[in-house]
Amino acid sequence: MFAGPYGLIYDYSIERERLMRAVGRAVWGIDMSVLYASMEVTGRVTDGATILDVPCGGGVAFRALRSDQDVRYIAADLSEEMLARARRRATQQSLSRVEFAVADMRALPFADEEADLFLSYNGLHMLDDPERAVTEIARCLKPGGELVGTSLLAEGSWQQRALIGIGRRRGFPVPPSRRNLRRWLTATGIAEPEIEPDQGLAVFRGHKKQTED
């Protein structure tokens, strides 16, 4: 989702948890630890599962993935630059099974009901039409499949609101509101979605409803 200097800064920062937690508190007024804690889900999936990671960025969500883990992991991003970084990260972690793909969150090149777990970190707030991306994510999830991701929200600290205003003047989209994100998730079949904590960066998670017989 990022490219050029913004991508470089983002990737450098997000890979350094202590730095990102300090920056999150001081600059954005948010607790970044919730993002890193949510990524532990990848280490708990069952053998044979399919994981879609979109946008994968530089591969930050690989951190809990084990080299011997028997899963199909597809890391996708719209940015070739980010995918190159993700490939390097996979090599550094000896993750030889990770597959890579160029993909737009608003039109994912994956089959219906393909994923047991869908990861989506810090992508929705970079889109002009995040609702469309949520619809695509739900389409790709199997019934009972799990969604875990993060997004900046329109609500937040005074620091965050000020930075959102600066970003808007530079052409960045306004992040979704908590209410709209919950509405989109529910409308696309994510049962009782959780959006926590009550701050400007939230982890959203939930399971796709099972198909009725």
Task: Give, region by region, the residue ranges found by the protein language model.
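Core SAM-dependent methyltransferase catalytic element
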Residues: 189-213
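A short glycine-rich, Lys/Arg-flanked "PGG" loop and its adjoining helix->strand segment in the class I
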Residues: 131-143
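A short acidic, Gly/Pro-enriched loop at the edge of an enzyme's catalytic core
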Residues: 106-117
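Conserved class I S-adenosyl-L-methionine
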Residues: 1-45, 64, 148-170
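Short alpha-helix
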Residues: 173-188
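Class I SAM-dependent methyltransferase SAM/SAH-binding core
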Residues: 50-107
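A short SAM/SAH-binding and catalytic strip from SAM-dependent methyltransferases
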Residues: 117-129
